[in-house]
């Protein structure tokens, strides 16, 4: 059924197709096309002190402003990561800014943190009936100068803290100029120290400790990843999301879309994301959660990431190419990996 729906959706511009697909799902059309959602096995995981009903989550970027939580929670996800949100609303980059490469099950996007701002998301969560696990991914506004980036992150953390089960710090989007520089050396130390100080204050204010995770890039020069991991592990962040989209074009070099700027996601990212995941898994202690993202297109991919050491996995581009049935496939793969009936 989804193959037919996808043919129709792919006739639309990607952002329009995304909105239409979510509206159709809200009407129940896509839910009806995915039998067995409510009979999915429970695959409980306790990670970062949070009880997840299963380890399969939605990656940031799919529901930036929390507008589709009612739809997404019915698909079988164990958690939703909303955002990226910034302290102030911003339009993102000019359109077109998303490009499909169907023959490679890939996307290139240069969205640029388009979002309504943190405050509207917080209001939606405050009145939402959604009771599942929610992470919120935060970033800096594009017009905030690099020397003030830390304050943007601290402000965003303060805004979302009361409604988040965990907060993901996005330092790795390739579509905000200078953002990835925050992954390195002194800038990273300063940022993590500032956020942990702010988290301590917020924990006392809200009487709860919200885990902080950092989302990292897949693109690293020799030695850079180890240096970044040194800082993240030394500063005892609660988790690491590996990875964001890549600036590389391996596997899609001959396509017309390869000339477009932005981050590449989907199947061509699989090998690179797995390599980074493996490096992080080899370094981290068991206290540091590991969330796998990037190029997860099948249940086999889920099994592979869990084998490599991931505690949780996240889907995005796979949902666009495989549809909501991928969530079921992923959860059942996680159940089999845990030795449970699927």
Swiss-Prot record:
It is found in: Cell membrane. One of its GO terms (biological process) is 'de novo' UMP biosynthetic process. The keyword Cell membrane applies. Its EC number is 1.3.5.2. Binds 1 FMN per subunit. It catalyses: (S)-dihydroorotate + a quinone = orotate + a quinol. Substrate binds at residues 64, 109-113, 170, 175, 244-245. One of its GO terms (cellular component) is plasma membrane. Pathway: Pyrimidine metabolism; UMP biosynthesis via de novo pathway; orotate from (S)-dihydroorotate (quinone route): step 1/1. Its cofactor is FMN. It is a peripheral membrane protein. Its main location: membrane. The active site is at 173 (nucleophile). Keywords: Cell membrane, Flavoprotein, FMN, Membrane, Oxidoreductase, Pyrimidine biosynthesis. The keyword Membrane applies. One of its GO terms (molecular function) is dihydroorotate dehydrogenase (quinone) activity. FMN binds at residues 60-64, 84, 137, 170, 215, 243, 266, 295, 316-317. NCBIfam families: PRK05286.1-2, PRK05286.2-5, pyrD_sub2. Belongs to the dihydroorotate dehydrogenase family. Type 2 subfamily. Monomer. Catalyzes the conversion of dihydroorotate to orotate with quinone as electron acceptor. HAMAP family: DHO_dh_type2 (MF_00225). This is Dihydroorotate dehydrogenase (quinone).
């Amino acid at each position: 059924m989804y193959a037919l729906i996808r043919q129709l959706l792919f006739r639309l511009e990607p952002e329009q197709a995304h909105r239409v697909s979510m509206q159709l799902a809200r009407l129940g059309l896509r839910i009806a096309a995915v039998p067995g959602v409510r009979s999915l096995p429970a695959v409980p995981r306790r990670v970062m002190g949070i009880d997840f009903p299963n380890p399969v989550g939605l990656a940031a970027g799919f529901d930036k402003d929390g507008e589709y939580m009612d739809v997404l929670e019915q698909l079988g996800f164990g958690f939703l990561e909303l955002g990226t949100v910034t302290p102030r609303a911003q339009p993102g980059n000019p359109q077109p800014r998303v490009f499909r490469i169907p023959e490679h099950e890939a996307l290139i996007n240069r969205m640029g943190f388009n979002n309504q701002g943190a405050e509207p998301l917080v209001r939606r969560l405050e009145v939402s009936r959604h009771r599942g696990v929610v992470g919120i991914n935060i970033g800096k506004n594009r017009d905030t100068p690099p020397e003030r980036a830390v304050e943007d992150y601290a402000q965003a953390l303060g805004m979302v803290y009361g409604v988040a089960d965990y907060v993901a710090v996005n330092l790795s989007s390739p579509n905000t100029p200078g953002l990835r520089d925050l992954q390195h050396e002194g800038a990273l130390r300063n940022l993590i120290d500032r956020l942990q100080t702010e988290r301590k204050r917020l924990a006392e204010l809200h009487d709860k400790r919200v885990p902080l995770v950092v989302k990292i890039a897949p693109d690293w020069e020799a030695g850079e990843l180890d240096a970044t991991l040194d800082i993240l592990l030394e500063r005892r962040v609660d988790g690491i999301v590996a990875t964001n989209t890549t600036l590389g074009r391996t596997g899609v070099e001959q396509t017309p879309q390869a000339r477009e700027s932005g981050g590449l996601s989907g199947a061509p990212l699989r090998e690179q994301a797995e390599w980074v995941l493996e490096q992080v898994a080899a370094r981290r202690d068991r206290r540091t959660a590991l969330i796998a993202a990037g190029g997860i297109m099948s249940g086999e991919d889920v099994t592979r990431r869990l084998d490599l050491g991931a505690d949780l996995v996240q889907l995005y581009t796979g949902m666009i190419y495989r549809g909501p049935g991928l969530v079921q496939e992923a959860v059942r793969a996680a159940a089999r990996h845990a030795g449970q009936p699927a």
